[in-house]
Amino acid sequence: MGEQQLWERVVGGHFVLAKRSFWPNFFSRLVARLQWNPMAIDLTPDARAWPELPDDRRRRLTTLLAGFCVAEDAVAEHLTPFADAARGAKLASQESLMAWVFFLQRRDEQRHAKLFDRIGSEVLGLPGDTPAERRAAARAYATPAVLELFEERLPAMAAEIAEGRTGLDEGVSLYHMLLEGVVFDAGQHALLDDLADGALPGVREGVERVERDERWHVGFGLRCLVETKPTADLLDDLLARAGEAAEAWGDAVPAAIRHESAHKVAHRLHVAGLTATRAVA
């Protein structure tokens, strides 16, 4: 038997590789439609309105916004090993193209980090002359669970992936399915509900844009999970940890939103054909 031909045709002496999957192109085109500038959002009305909000509301919003200051920087910093792992994985889609999509996602995360740094500086009034200094100040307001997830568990997972001790399946289970798909999902929806009255219009606009980006991030992570062919044990562990992830914000996120975000994991896995049982509300 001859060797498998890896190209579908030759054009001008160049080998044209067969298109193994439409998914990388799908996500790339989606990203192109979602571009926005975090520096263009006007936070002036928000800065004026912030001191006038009731104390309880400011405390709740500070917990969420400060948590995102910490978390968005962390997810931007620790995504590169995932792209490297995608290049070396055996996927249905072209591995190098899937790695490129991780790069596109990292650009999104960097944009989100800039937005929340602006909110921390211009609205919350966090002290510090640099993003790193303001992020250090934000840690005092973030919940212990958020700090543990994004400053301990995520960096540890990224290091294990970089060293080849953990696969892409475990990485996207934590990063895309739990941190983005549950923790971020719950925090963003709590913010959008709280700010539906227009009290902080610039913050709400920014969170809306971030939330739209995160939808494709989670979808991309789910696609990666499907293509890595995860074990039943990994999926069971993912489902078991969803509830814990939803509790990361504490009382800053209403119980109904926590419950809904946690159950989205089971729904996504079912829709993707990874599990046979639909989530029970």
Ranges and model annotations:
Residues M1-A281:
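Non-heme di-metal
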